[in-house]
From Swiss-Prot:
GO cellular component, one term: cytosol
Region named G4: 572-575
Protein name per UniProt: Translation initiation factor IF-2
High-level lineage: Bacteria, Bacillati, Actinomycetota, Actinomycetes, Mycobacteriales
Record's compositionally biased regions (Basic and acidic residues): 145-155
Gene name of the record: infB
UniProt organism field: Corynebacterium efficiens (strain DSM 44549 / YS-314 / AJ 12310 / JCM 11189 / NBRC 100395)
Localization of this protein: Cytoplasm
Span list, region G1: 468-475
InterPro entries: EF-G-like_DII (IPR053905), IF2_II (IPR044145), IF2_N (IPR006847), P-loop_NTPase (IPR027417), Small_GTP-bd (IPR005225), T_Tr_GTP-bd_dom (IPR000795), TF_IF2_bacterial-like (IPR000178), TIF_IF2 (IPR015760)
tr-type G domain boundaries: 459-631
Keyword Cytoplasm: yes
Cross-referenced PROSITE patterns: G_TR_2 (PS51722)
Biological role: One of the essential components for the initiation of protein synthesis. Protects formylmethionyl-tRNA from spontaneous hydrolysis and promotes its binding to the 30S ribosomal subunits. Also involved in the hydrolysis of GTP during the formation of the 70S ribosomal complex.
Amino acid sequence: MPGKLRVHELAKKLGITSKELLATLKEQGEFVKTASSTIEPPVVKKMQEHYQATGGAKPDTDNKPTPAKPAAKPGAPAPKPGTAQKPTAPTPGAVAAPKPGTAAAKPTPAKPAAPKPTAAKPAPAKPTAPKPATPAFSGPTPGDAAKKAAEDKATPKPGGEAPRPNAMPRPMAKPGPKPGARAPRVANNPFSTGAADRPGPRPGGGGPRPGGGPRPGGAPRPQGGQRSGAPRDGQGGPRGQRPGPGSGGPRPQGGNAAGAASQERQGGGRRPSPAMMPPTPGQMPAKAPGKGGRGGGQGGPGGGSGGFNRGGGGGAGRGGRRGGTAGAFGRPGGAPRRGRKSKRQKRNEYESMQAPNVIGGVRLPDGRGQTLRLARGASLSDFADKIGADAAALVQALFNLGEMVTATASVSDETLMLLGDEMNFKVEVVSPEDEDRELLESFDLQFGEDIGDEQDLAKRPPVVTVMGHVDHGKTRLLDTIRKANVGSGEAGGITQGIGAYQVKVEVEDDLRTITFLDTPGHEAFTAMRARGAKSTDIAVLVVAADDGVMPQTIEAINHAKAADVPIVVAVNKIDKPDASPEKIRGQLTEYGLVPEEYGGDTIFVDISAKQGTNIDELLASVCLTADAELDLVANPDMDAQGVAIEAHLDRGRGPVATVIVQRGTLRVGDSIVVGDTYGRVRRMVDEYGRDVDEAGPSRPVQVQGLNGVPGAGDNLLVVEDDRIARQIANQRNARKRNALAARSRKRVSLEDLDSVLKETSVLNLILKGDNAGSVEALEEALLKIEMDDEVELNIIDRGVGAVTQTNVTLAAASNAVIIAFNVRAEGKATEEANAEGVDIRYYTIIYRAIEEVEAALKGMLKPIYEEREVGKAEIRAIFKASAIGLIAGCMVEEGKVRRNATARIIRDGNVIASNAKIESLRREKDDVTEVSAGYECGMVLSYPDIAVGDKIEVFEMVEVPRDS
């Protein structure tokens, strides 16, 4: 069948019911919802093998020849009368022969006989009881048993005519096409009516059935009877006591379901299990006797007669109700018994009782130390999918742990680990590098390795990064090498972006190509310097001979060492009078850079970038280091891989990324993905603005055609087509968004909820810059500003390019300030900003932007007030006025007393009023604003409980400037 099978289709194919197949799937650990659910091919194969191994429908069809199928209907009662003992004498042996191993273990004659010694009255009626002992011989095969059964069916049996109407009216119509599959289940159908649902005879199941007479009390039960270990008690009467001989004569095959099931098993059929048909109260046999069933002929619901059991009595029968499952699985009838539990159910129950995992009334799964890998910024829904739990339960559990999180919100790493610890899960947050590698592997891509053999590799030019402190001459050095002037065009004379150049220089009469990267030296550009160190082969550390080792010099050394990049030191400005190259060598020795002349392995070159002194010697040292210490090779024939060292938004060209190809060849028209952006290479230009059709290893080019501005430092990868590039970029973008949301989300616990809800001063900023590196550096520098908890800096948006109307609209809605770094407002953005009252600040030097933002944050701080004493007075007399109240007659002892001032009232050294107001102040009969020391006055205080002798201290709160 094409496609996946559904449950009901597989059940039909196997010849079983969908309910039975669903139960088996659940027992095997395959959880399928409904009969219309699809099943994977491995599960289909597993079920087929399961039913073949347990003797299911398929093997039965092999063991039952075609002639036996039509004979099953009329022959069902034939083998069971008392007169059929002679022709079917060997049949019990045939029944037991297919299971010689179980003949001794299960149908042990001693166990069934032991509980029934009281049945001594019917002793003479079982002369054939010893015959089932014949299973000791090998016995005929199931095929022989089928032949014998067919012969028995062909012979008319007088005793079998009576029960025929109830024997097989319905079930054999179903198992007709697949008798081996349907026959055992029909006997177990609790919704059948009487013995009509009992299966027909099995191959080898035509053995003699005892008559209705009583059985000897100590006689062993025949082999084809019920299962071992459980005696057959009548389904209404007490165990071992039968009302008497069966009133209906010998029972047909359907009378004892246990016998039928046993014959089916011994005849090659599958073995039913209680888990396949869980008993329900409607299927259980009743404890109270029924109204009396037909002796033997009524089947399972009767008084327990039929098969190898004695005929049922009227008092013990249950013929009036629908068929039960007594004896269906080889167990006796009687009181209902709970179905057996699987080992998995028992183990799960035991483990849940041993260590219940309940958090705040929510029951959660126990991880038992299992390791979970979650992406950074994952939500509780992602967590719940991993462990198979309900996301709402995790939300409630986390709320009880003091964290308020929604099911779909990105959660911080600490919160994920906290929740994992509570459930005994070990949560591992996947690093961005591992996450990106797994993403590329899902598309059969990899980054960072050359593809091909060694003969495919070719030499490539070295990539050299010029690093050092600000104003130490890095850009001037590159200008001298390139014979150009770049530094004069930079704002403030400092480099605020990475410049990439490829120059051809003559070194020892050999024309060499070297790629140079110029990194910023200002402290705000730490990330740029680190990125430049990771993208390079050799680092040239420029140190001014007149300035010495500075903080950014040390930082550049650490970046180069972290990237495991060899360092060549260029001691610049040796032409200045106060230059001291030897001092520089001594200082750098402390940081592990020991000159060769001191016995170390670091090359030091004294240069003057301004005068052009020793520039050739520096280039020769760079080439020598590249040849001696590095094996600079790459495969130029593979798909290009590289890194974006800078990116910006050009108004006429759109997003432009400056990339260095590390391996392979980048061509116009290639589909590329750079970080979370993608596109097709529309145009490439070199550092001189000339169009380039292809760029080989170590070649810096500017790429146009991306759908957005990538981040500085993002990897460039050529993929097969735009569809793959778009999928990779979208997944990266979603992960980046989740990680950013988790990082920016402030953890709010119930304990600090009150303080969070209090009004705080927030400065919202929108950052716009000329390139991605500048925006990144500005954002990091602003976030490093240390302020009190009273104010908060919130960067709500950042981007590359001019200030647009969209930025102004967002700023107006969020009451934000726009910081424009090396860009201007375009179009009607300025008019809209003026109309909306949006403040746009323009900067060209980064530290000025940092200083002004820091000053703005300080201005947003709540003012600090301190108490300043104004004067002191003493109450000398108290006057009463009906309209005013108490009037204090005072003498001003120090300073001044002002009207509406705040006063502190002290009595016997204790403050009785700390914040009283001077509501009225008079001198003689005149209202005055203040009274100086040495004068008397009358005042009315807001605090009425005053007395003669009280001291009044008048003070005021004065705002003081903040130090920080």
